[in-house]
């Protein structure tokens, strides 16, 4: 049986439901049918055979605002970073489109906040199920627009979907409190309520997972969102919008406004300064994060930020070399070194240094294969663009000019302008760029140290503190170092630490707040104290 929610006071759209498990029915003339023809780019569907047979419905190029697919006045090209070929032209949203998206989200919030936690949970679960059903197509979209090896893209889609599953469950666990006061005729209650419209700005390196980690929590809490995806990877965000629509997520709850690099600054400013936006969630560089914090300050908006890192990877003399090398490979070369928690500097104690460097170099030569992300066996795809390659190249040249030794790699790869050889440097010192500037590429610089105190001092010298790793077999040392490292996340004898169940975030200039875990939903909730008197 269908049930309708109609709140005239908030000017929201009519939302049609069936309980339980029915899709939203948009009003006539509203939402473009999810199953209808999609204006997906032919180039993307045919790219290198890797996207042959991909569902056209998932290849969207327009913005998604208020439950409708809308073009913009202009478009911008999205390129395959492996070949440089154009994948398609995407709507280039500007300030007008950004404000319209915020308005749509605000109007939808009036109704969405009143939807029961059980129903929000059900809708998120449907979205999760659709991601799993379409996981192969979604993975191929990621590989096409980011260059990520297809095996890793599949892993990201599962990771991404698991956030929707997790927060579908957390939606039903938003509890308040009862506080007993000294006054016998009073009771004090603490309510948790959704904060409002959230502006969500996401990066290109995890174009799906960074959306669901934020949006899953926001929607579970009862918030609505406006997503501005990275200009390099908008197709993943738009594909998620299509699946959200198919899942029955109401019109205006999830909005996507892609834009070009030229418009990114003004669009970001527009959504972050709009008075109808109550929350900003951003993943990206520390530099950009500071700009957005300035925008938020004028209207005192709630902010969550996951910014840059300079993750140390410490190997103590007591470590198992083989385990440390395996952890280093996983931590450094996932997504070709383009993750915010990638190890950026390897601190290796003198007694184990030579054995570690030798084993690390051998593992790199044996296990890393540079190639197109769609090619079977590829472990290292292209960097996102030539600017990223230039940064790695600059760091390598700087280190070598100051005395570092190239153990393996060290130059651009013959495959193309966006490829760089996996590189290992030794004899690295702290005056080199690669030790105090986030690389975001396949470069592993090794610094030799003598004492535990020295390693901790080097690791904590950074003004950022997202993740840190260390390998040791000494239980007392493990506790000391884990507590002393100034980071938000620590991997002890482990190189891969991200999990939907665990809090993700940093300290210092690596950001504010936590994502994922049971704490992630709190970023989108406000506490309200209610004093009930006269009892």
Curated annotation (Swiss-Prot):
The modification N6-succinyllysine is found at residues 126, 135, 184, 265, 402. Redox-regulated. Inhibited under oxydizing conditions. Disulfide bonds join 340-342. Catalyzes one step in the degradation of the inhibitory neurotransmitter gamma-aminobutyric acid (GABA). The modification N6-acetyllysine is found at residues 126, 265, 365, 411. One of its GO terms (biological process) is succinate metabolic process. Belongs to the aldehyde dehydrogenase family. It catalyses: succinate semialdehyde + NAD(+) + H2O = succinate + NADH + 2 H(+). The keyword Coiled coil does not apply. The record marks 205 as: Transition state stabilizer. GO terms for cellular component: mitochondrion. The lineage of its organism: Eukaryota, Metazoa, Chordata, Craniata, Vertebrata. This is Succinate-semialdehyde dehydrogenase, mitochondrial. NCBIfam families: SSADH.
């Amino acid at each position: 049986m269908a049930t309708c929610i109609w709140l005239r006071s908030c000017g929201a759209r009519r939302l049609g439901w069936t309980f339980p498990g029915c899709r939203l029915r948009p009003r006539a003339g509203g939402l473009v049918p999810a199953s209808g023809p999609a204006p997906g780019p032919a180039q993307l569907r045919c790219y290198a055979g890797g996207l042959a047979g991909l569902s056209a419905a998932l290849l969207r190029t327009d913005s998604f605002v208020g439950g409708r697919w809308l073009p913009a006045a202009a478009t911008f090209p999205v390129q395959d970073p492996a070949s440089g070929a154009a994948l398609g032209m995407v709507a280039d949203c500007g300030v007008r489109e950004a404000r319209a998206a915020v308005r749509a989200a605000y109007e939808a919030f009036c109704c969405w906040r009143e939807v029961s936690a059980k129903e929000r949970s059900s809708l998120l679960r449907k979205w999760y199920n659709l991601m799993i059903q379409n996981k192969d197509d979604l993975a191929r979209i990621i590989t096409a627009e980011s260059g990520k090896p297809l095996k890793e893209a599949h892993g990201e889609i599962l990771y991404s979907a698991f956030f929707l599953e997790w927060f579908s469950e957390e939606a039903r666990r938003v509890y308040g409190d009862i506080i007993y006061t000294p006054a016998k005729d009073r009771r004090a209650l603490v309510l948790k309520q959704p904060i409002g419209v959230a502006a969500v700005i996401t990066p290109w390196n995890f174009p799906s997972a960074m959306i669901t980690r934020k949006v899953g929590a926001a929607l579970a809490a009862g918030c609505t969102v406006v997503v501005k995806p990275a200009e390099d990877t908008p197709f993943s965000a738009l594909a998620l919008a299509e699946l959200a629509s198919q899942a029955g997520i109401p019109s205006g709850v999830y909005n996507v406004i892609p834009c070009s690099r030229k418009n990114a600054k003004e669009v970001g400013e527009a959504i972050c300064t709009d008075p109808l936006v109550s929350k900003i969630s951003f993943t990206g560089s520390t530099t950009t994060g500071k700009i957005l914090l300035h925008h938020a300050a004028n209207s005192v908006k709630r902010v969550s930020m996951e910014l840059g890192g300079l993750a140390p990877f410490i190997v103590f003399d007591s470590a198992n070399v083989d385990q440390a090398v395996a952890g280093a490979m996983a931590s450094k070369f996932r997504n070709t070194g383009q993750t915010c928690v990638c190890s950026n500097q390897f601190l290796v104690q003198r007694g184990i240094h030579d054995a570690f460097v030798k084993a690390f170099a051998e593992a790199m030569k044996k296990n890393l294969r540079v190639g197109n992300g769609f090619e079977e066996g590829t472990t290292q795809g292209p960097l996102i663009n030539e600017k990223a390659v230039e940064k790695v190249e600059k760091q390598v040249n700087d280190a070598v000019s100051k005395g570092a030794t190239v153990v393996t790699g060290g130059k651009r790869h013959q495959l193309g302008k966006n490829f760089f050889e996996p590189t290992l440097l030794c004899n690295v010192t702290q005056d080199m760029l690669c030790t105090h500037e986030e690389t975001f590429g396949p470069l592993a610089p090794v610094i030799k140290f003598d004492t535990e105190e020295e390693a901790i001092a080097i690791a904590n010298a950074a003004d950022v503190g997202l993740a840190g790793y260390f390998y040791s077999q000494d239980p007392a040392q493990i506790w000391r170092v884990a507590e002393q490292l100034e980071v938000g996340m620590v991997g002890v004898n482990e190189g891969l630490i991200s999990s939907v169940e665990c809090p993700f975030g940093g300290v210092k200039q690596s950001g504010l707040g936590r994502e994922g875990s049971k704490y992630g939903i709190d970023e989108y909730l406000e506490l309200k104290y209610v004093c009930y008197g006269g009892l």
